Amino acid sequence: MTGMTSNGRRPLLNRRLTEFGTTIFAEMSALALSTDSINLGQGFPDTDGPEEIREAAVRALRDGRGNQYPPGPGVPELRTAIAAHQKHHYGLSYDPDREVLVTAGATEAIAASLLALVEPGDEVIALEPYYDSYAAGIAMAGGTRVPVTLRPHEGRFRLDLDELRDAVTDNTRLLLLNTPHNPTGTVLSREELGEIAKLAVERDLLVVTDEVYEHLVFDDAEHVPLAGFPGMRERTVTIGSAGKTFSFTGWKVGWITSTPDLVTAVRSAKQFLTYVASGPFQYAVAEALALPDTYFEAFRADLRAKRDLLAAGLTAAGFEVFRPAGTYFVTTDIRPLGESDGFAFCRALPERAGVVAIPNAVFYDHREEGAPFVRFAFCKRTEVLEAAARRLRAAR
């Protein structure tokens, strides 16, 4: 029997992971290739980041820096740069030797944090819809996932703070937050974060915050790290990443910043995952984090223009568009098109329009909540987005 051991007693896959098969990203990317469609599904840029940072990686390779195992916590140059970044942008002070840990991207940072801090029986609250690795990480740690759903209201997806409070029980160990939020593009406000901080202190909760889109906020939105609120530094693990900010997603360089005790705990799990990774790229990312503010401003402006281009094209094609305040994803409602099943819609869209998108329902425990929503990525070249908009309008 497929998937069974030779004696047929139980499936090969650990039962904690039985709900996680091939990801929707693999399925839709394969569809994009087989239909020669424009892939606006998976969130990676179609151009590389700054040339001087690529050259920094080449220089590190040639100089023999990082070609062997780098230090377990990360190379000192990168840890120092991460601490300087947090101080410069947010006024948060971290000791690069004791309060910074470099990881193999944010995905490992999430997994290591959950494996380190969560035990069987612990409840973990996550904002739904959520990045798919959250569910897998909680499952691998043996925790119980408790979703709190963001729902559309007045053009954006909003958090119901009362619902969040009600979700906390005596078994709640940890809040897993993501702001700017993938896939909805919501950026939690200073006021919302203040209430979350009060709740965490009151109920003595740990918090892991995924802030990989920290520099991709638009219009009047503001990214405010939760660790800066009263009582939060000592209970918050903050996750960052180079991939989204510098358009080098393949380098897999992420990090956490937290207290010495929390960093030590996460490192205890991380060292048995990758141990170390991305040696030469760590030196390059250290230089990237030191780029002038003008780099971050220009990057935001470019993505804001692309957001507006794709949002306008989607609106013209008949979608209801939730204009994101952050990230590089646009969530749409397909019901104005006479559709209600995001899975069926996305599987048919490549043949129908030559464009690939992702059904948001894959990011929900409550699949019915996400059924009519579809996500498009706009971290692509302008001409690609223009072509996608034309195809969608023509297929209307």
Regions found by a protein language model. Name each.
Residues 146, 150-219:
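Active-site phosphate-binding strand-loop segment of PLP-dependent enzymes
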Residues 286, 302-311, 321-334:
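Conserved glycine-rich beta-strand-loop-beta hairpin in the small C-terminal domain of fold type I
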Residues 116-138:
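Conserved PLP-anchoring active-site segment centered on the Schiff-base-forming lysine
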